[in-house]
Amino acid sequence: MQIEDYLKAGKIAGEVRENVRKKDWIGSTLAEICEYVESEIIKRGAKCAFPVNTSLNEVAAHYTAEPNDSKTVSDSDLIKIDLGAQINGYIADTAVTVNYDPQYDSLVQAAENALQAAM
């Protein structure tokens, strides 16, 4: 079942990533985002592979909100959300950048273009 488990984990992680990308997070706390992502992974039949990372602005990666984290997303923020789903120990890891400040549009697009070129 190894390949099937990887594929299922990847499908779940991808679905959750796309839902996260489309959602409006302005006004949400980082802890609320983490709770949402974790519940979406579990709802689809997987477990979280690691704590959800929610990194705001200059924080490059791997910030994990504490349960009572009061940091809130504003309309001028750039947030990176890193998530992982696991099925029977087989992990899919993915991330998405959500941008609310037009001055960062070209940066986000350049990163997306680099990712697509690498794949």
Summary of predicted features, one role per range:
Residues M1-M119:
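Active-site neighborhoods and metal-handling regions in enzymes and metal-associated proteins
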